[in-house]
Amino acid sequence: MSDQQQPPVYKIALGIEYDGSKYYGWQRQNEVRSVQEKLEKALSQVANEPITVFCAGRTDAGVHGTGQVVHFETTAQRKDAAWTLGVNANLPGDIAVRWVKAVPDDFHARFSATARRYRYIIYNHRLRPAVLSKGVTHFYEPLDAERMHRAAQCLLGENDFTSFRAVQCQSRTPWRNVMHINVTRHGPYVVVDIKANAFVHHMVRNIVGSLMEVGAHNQPESWIAELLAAKDRTLAAATAKAEGLYLVAVDYPDRYDLPKPPMGPLFLAD
């Protein structure tokens, strides 16, 4: 008797949006809420088999995503609406699938990515916000966004980011390639937009923490360049809070033809 034929395996990519304020980060962990665990549970219900997802970037506790990308493999053959509307019906309100795309075998959400982009949102006002309290970081001292932008330009290109790297970072190298970093003001909001090939642990939040010191005129514009050259985390400012940080986009080679929805968050244009 011939062996039973194995069902075909499909590889699917999804775009995911989430409010990370009630989660202990992206990665599945025992006994605490994670975005990965909720997504895998919802996908498994739709697929009627256990699903494991792989993501482009494992965000920390309290960090949000508008442009997270994941992939998974399944023998379940479903219409696109099942992987979007169907999965969303099984997800909590603070996690949502934005798009679905069948991808070839060589695609990997993490290893195929060529760049990641983050936006950090500062609510720069004397009084704290209420409605967006978990979606922005409040900073009450007046910030000079143009000064912050000028100071940040020394971070462009390939550099050793030891001064902006968490002590517990497990990456083999502190070197990263920053493609752009822009600081702009939108009314009471100051936005730090940074894109790099990859990021060391807490890199964006550590950079923002130091840029806020420059923006508040507590440090000179030259301080960021001095920190970069010093390669000493203890000299830089405290890590900025998680609430204001969003993973907004992940770049992949054009041949995968993945959707590119608006990055956001909220009012921010691409």
Swiss-Prot record:
Site feature location: Interaction with tRNA: 58, 78, 110, 126, 139
Top-level lineage group: Bacteria
UniProt keyword tRNA processing present: yes
UniProt-listed Enzyme Commission number(s): 5.4.99.12
Enzyme class: isomerase
Region (Interaction with tRNA) location: 168-172
GO MF, one example: RNA binding
Residue ranges, annotated region (RNA binding): 107-111
One Pfam family cited in the UniProt record for this chain: PseudoU_synth_1
Binding site for substrate: 118
Annotated Gene3D superfamilies: Pseudouridine synthase I, catalytic domain, C-terminal subdomain, Pseudouridine synthase I, catalytic domain, N-terminal subdomain
Keywords: Isomerase, tRNA processing
Active-site residues per Swiss-Prot or TrEMBL entry: 60 (nucleophile)
GO biological process: tRNA pseudouridine synthesis
Job description of the protein: Formation of pseudouridine at positions 38, 39 and 40 in the anticodon stem and loop of transfer RNAs.
HAMAP family, per database record: TruA
PANTHER family: PSEUDOURIDYLATE SYNTHASE (PTHR11142), TRNA PSEUDOURIDINE SYNTHASE-LIKE 1 (PTHR11142:SF0)
Assembly with partners or alone: Homodimer.
Family: Belongs to the tRNA pseudouridine synthase TruA family.
Protein name in the entry: tRNA pseudouridine synthase A
Organism: Escherichia coli (strain 55989 / EAEC)
Upper taxonomic lineage: Bacteria, Pseudomonadati, Pseudomonadota, Gammaproteobacteria, Enterobacterales
Gene name in the database record: truA
